[in-house]
């Protein structure tokens, strides 16, 4: 049996590894000639860390995951802690530590684990067709590839998703812009083992430790889509949006490199009622494009891969296996997308009354409520 995997990002490579472990040959195709990850880093929470270990890639997490031991929310003006707490209870309950990791490092290490020579780059899909014998995809260079099944892990702009769904869903603008990048850890910004978030005015500024003595940082600002802003205006834009914010925020704006800082308009897509059509399955962002507000986008793709591998260990009947994959994943990924959307709206001031109430909750937070919510999300994954 042979699978075609479209996409060599986190989801596609996880899927290829999972299928190979289940005894299925995989050919992996990637649209671009060189993968340049969107975003500087990614939060891999314990459900994702467990998936990586299950797939044989646990060493990547241990080596490149940042030392995240505490969380704190800080007042945007004073910079004083609204709440601060240890993540030890989360680690104890979930059985794994969270591992924030540079996207470039994660992508590189996963690609090396699978084998760079085992990915065909510069292969952008145009269409697919299925018949009784299998499924065929065509690429923009005029070539084609055939297999017994097809895993569409080609991202939030998936070219194969309309074929699976029977319609072309529209991406929904979540209402805010995110700037992100990496800076050297500086205790004047935040403790080096803590996820620190400054909140106020429906905006936030976050710092999270990754490997090699660096912070992953991001700024969120509710804004209309399509503003004419770029790297040339980046520092001035952030200085304007965060005028009057605490000294560490000003120091971060001064320290960042505009040329390596990403500006992303955040979108999601309404959850789908299906992930499979015939021999073709959606996986990762192609199947559940989410906002990053609960840090579960990458983890969900890893979960997809683990479930995909498991169903093919149970049966070699493609229809039955993919039907079971869909049954196990549809509700889970819908829940994650909608949880992230709800968190997004509260964080970014869609209704400022609710956002102000959240700020007040943070001032009374011991950590227990936040950790309970995170554990609920994490432990609902396929590996518990």
UniProtKB/Swiss-Prot annotation:
<dbReference type="InterPro" id="IPR036188">
    <property type="entry name" value="FAD/NAD-bd_sf"/>
</dbReference>
<feature type="binding site">
    <location>
        <begin position="295"/>
        <end position="299"/>
    </location>
    <ligand>
        <name>FAD</name>
    </ligand>
</feature>
<dbReference type="InterPro" id="IPR050493">
    <property type="entry name" value="FAD-dep_Monooxygenase_BioMet"/>
</dbReference>
<dbReference type="GO" id="GO:0071949">
    <property type="term" value="F:FAD binding"/>
</dbReference>
<feature type="binding site">
    <location>
        <position position="43"/>
    </location>
    <ligand>
        <name>FAD</name>
    </ligand>
</feature>
<feature type="binding site">
    <location>
        <position position="125"/>
    </location>
    <ligand>
        <name>FAD</name>
    </ligand>
</feature>
<keyword id="KW-0520">NAD</keyword>
<feature type="binding site">
    <location>
        <position position="204"/>
    </location>
    <ligand>
        <name>substrate</name>
    </ligand>
</feature>
<feature type="binding site">
    <location>
        <position position="178"/>
    </location>
    <ligand>
        <name>substrate</name>
    </ligand>
</feature>
<dbReference type="GO" id="GO:0102099">
    <property type="term" value="F:FAD-dependent urate hydroxylase activity"/>
</dbReference>
<dbReference type="GO" id="GO:0019628">
    <property type="term" value="P:urate catabolic process"/>
</dbReference>
<feature type="site" description="Involved in substrate activation for the transfer of oxygen from the flavin hydroperoxide">
    <location>
        <position position="204"/>
    </location>
</feature>
<keyword id="KW-0560">Oxidoreductase</keyword>
<protein>
    <recommendedName>
        <fullName>FAD-dependent urate hydroxylase</fullName>
        <ecNumber>1.14.13.113</ecNumber>
    </recommendedName>
</protein>
<keyword id="KW-0274">FAD</keyword>
<keyword id="KW-0285">Flavoprotein</keyword>
<dbReference type="Pfam" id="PF01494">
    <property type="entry name" value="FAD_binding_3"/>
</dbReference>
<feature type="binding site">
    <location>
        <begin position="30"/>
        <end position="31"/>
    </location>
    <ligand>
        <name>FAD</name>
    </ligand>
</feature>
<feature type="binding site">
    <location>
        <position position="11"/>
    </location>
    <ligand>
        <name>FAD</name>
    </ligand>
</feature>
<dbReference type="InterPro" id="IPR002938">
    <property type="entry name" value="FAD-bd"/>
</dbReference>
<keyword id="KW-0503">Monooxygenase</keyword>
<feature type="binding site">
    <location>
        <position position="285"/>
    </location>
    <ligand>
        <name>FAD</name>
    </ligand>
</feature>
<comment type="function">
    <text>Catalyzes the hydroxylation of uric acid to 5-hydroxyisourate.</text>
</comment>
<dbReference type="InterPro" id="IPR047712">
    <property type="entry name" value="HpxO"/>
</dbReference>
<dbReference type="GO" id="GO:0006144">
    <property type="term" value="P:purine nucleobase metabolic process"/>
</dbReference>
<keyword id="KW-0659">Purine metabolism</keyword>
<dbReference type="GO" id="GO:0016709">
    <property type="term" value="F:oxidoreductase activity, acting on paired donors, with incorporation or reduction of molecular oxygen, NAD(P)H as one donor, and incorporation of one atom of oxygen"/>
</dbReference>
<feature type="binding site">
    <location>
        <begin position="216"/>
        <end position="218"/>
    </location>
    <ligand>
        <name>substrate</name>
    </ligand>
</feature>
<comment type="pathway">
    <text>Purine metabolism; urate degradation.</text>
</comment>
<dbReference type="GO" id="GO:0004846">
    <property type="term" value="F:urate oxidase activity"/>
</dbReference>
<comment type="similarity">
    <text>Belongs to the FAD-dependent urate hydroxylase family.</text>
</comment>
């Amino acid at each position: 049996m042979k699978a075609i995997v479209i996409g060599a990002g986190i989801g596609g490579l996880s899927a290829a590894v999972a299928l190979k472990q289940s005894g299925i040959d995989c050919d992996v195709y990637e649209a671009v000639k060189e993968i340049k990850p969107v975003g500087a880093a990614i939060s891999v929470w314990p459900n994702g860390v467990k998936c990586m270990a299950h797939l044989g890639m646990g060493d990547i997490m241990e080596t490149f995951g940042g030392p995240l031991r505490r969380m704190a929310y800080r007042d945007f003006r004073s910079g004083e802690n609204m709440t601060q707490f240890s993540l030890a209870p989360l680690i104890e309950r979930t059985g794994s530590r969270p591992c924030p990791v540079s996207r470039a490092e994660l992508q590189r290490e996963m690609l090396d684990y699978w084998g760079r020579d085992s990915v065909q780059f510069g292969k952008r899909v145009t269409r697919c067709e299925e018949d009784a014998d299998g499924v065929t995809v065509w690429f923009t260079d005029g070539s084609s590839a055939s297999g017994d099944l097809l895993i569409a892990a080609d991202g939030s702009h998936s070219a194969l998703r309309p074929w699976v769904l029977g319609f072309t869903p529209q991406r929904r603008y979540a209402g805010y812009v995110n700037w992100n990048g990496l800076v050297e850890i500086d205790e004047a910004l935040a403790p080096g083992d803590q996820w620190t978030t400054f909140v106020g005015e429906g905006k936030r500024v976050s710092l999270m430790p990754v490997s090699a003595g660096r912070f992953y940082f991001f700024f969120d600002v509710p804004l209309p889509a399509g503003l004419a802003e770029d790297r040339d205006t980046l520092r001035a834009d952030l200085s304007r949006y965060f005028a009057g914010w605490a000294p560490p925020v000003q120091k971060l704006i001064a320290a960042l490199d505009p040329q390596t800082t990403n500006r992303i308009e955040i979108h999601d897509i309404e959850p789908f009622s299906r992930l499979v059509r015939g021999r073709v399955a959606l996986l990762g962002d192609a199947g559940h494009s989410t906002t990053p507000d609960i840090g579960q986008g990458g983890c969900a793709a890893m979960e997809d891969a683990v479930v995909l591998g498991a169903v093919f260990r149970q049966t070699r009947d493609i229809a039955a296996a993919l039907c079971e994959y869909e049954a196990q994943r549809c509700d889970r990924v819908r829940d994650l997308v909608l949880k992230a959307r709800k968190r997004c709206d509260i964080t970014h001031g869609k209704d400022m009354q609710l956002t102000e109430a959240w700020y007040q909750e943070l001032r009374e937070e011991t950590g227990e409520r936040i950790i309970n919510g995170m554990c609920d999300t994490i432990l609902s994954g396929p590996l518990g």
